[in-house]
Amino acid sequence: MNDVSKASLPKAIFLMGPTASGKTALAIELRKVLPVELISVDSALIYRGMDIGTAKPNADELKAAPHRLLDIRDPSQAYSAADFRRDALAQMAEITSAGRIPLLVGGTMLYFKALLEGLSPLPSADPEVRSRIEQQAAELGWEALHQQLQEIDPVAAARIHPNDPQRLSRALEVFFISGKTLTELTQTSGDALPYQVHQFAIAPASRELLHQRIELRFHQMLASGFEAEVRALFARGDLHTDLPSIRCVGYRQMWSYIEGEISYDEMVYRGVCATRQLAKRQMTWLRGWEGGRWLDSENPDRARKEVLQVVGAIAD
């Protein structure tokens, strides 16, 4: 698409960053001075009843800056990148038609990628193939199936944990149905995003600072009642660690503590480590991301001014 046709498209803003980088705080500040509406791009914030461990914006923050695509699923339900793209496009169209600018804020980079580039059509689920995979898993174990995926699609195998049966099963299913790997199919993009997108990435200048922020926030979550939140989910009786919701960082480790598998101190240690690993994966995405302007989260005033310098002109 040439520059002239791009300029005729409606505007949108991406504010991306690793966990605990200050994305939400900056987005709320920007909403005070720009004609924007916020859309959450976070695979954990979609779940109802999961507020503390996901660092969901609190009531005062949401009153000042409402976020769309929060609390749209029960923790028992799945939500895919394709679901997100559909929902985000609908919200963006609604915001744009009201004369405002969509500001998409979050750290689920797969969602940003799906929205920006589109998704290739994947084969629909096949109950017979899925049943055969599950039977194999029952006989051989998911570790053996992960090894099978490693031979078929090493790129997907590196991204999917052996203890993630839902995604592991889907990757194998796609290959058995189509004869093509999940990696091969997802590299074929669908429809690109029909917006002129201004992209920003916010993070601390050093990894050590990010690690400090992560550890501090995890302890703040514990002090705010995170254990009670997860115990309430545990008490429902219908949730388990194969669900994407309970595999969210922090929740998986607290769940293991509640089940008596690990000590409290081990839960804290593992929770902080898992969050750091998540941030590392997010930063890897961002370093390879084209077209983003970097902002320093340790200097929020300067970050705000830098966004306004770029976005102020499009908002007039």
From Swiss-Prot:
Catalysed reactions listed for this entry: adenosine(37) in tRNA + dimethylallyl diphosphate = N(6)-dimethylallyladenosine(37) in tRNA + diphosphate
Enzyme's top EC category: transferase
GO MF annotations, alphabetized: ATP binding; tRNA dimethylallyltransferase activity
Single biological process term from Gene Ontology: tRNA modification
InterPro entries: Dimethylallyltransferase, IPT, P-loop_NTPase
Annotated positions for site Interaction with substrate tRNA: T108, R130
Binding site for ATP: G17, P18, T19, A20, S21, G22, K23, T24
Record-listed E.C. numbers: 2.5.1.75
Keywords on record: ATP-binding, Magnesium, Nucleotide-binding, Transferase, tRNA processing
Sequence similarity: Belongs to the IPP transferase family.
Description of how the protein assembles with itself and partners: Monomer.
Protein name as it appears in the record: tRNA dimethylallyltransferase
Species per Swiss-Prot/TrEMBL record: Salmonella paratyphi A (strain AKU_12601)
Lineage: Bacteria, Pseudomonadati, Pseudomonadota, Gammaproteobacteria, Enterobacterales
Protein's gene: miaA
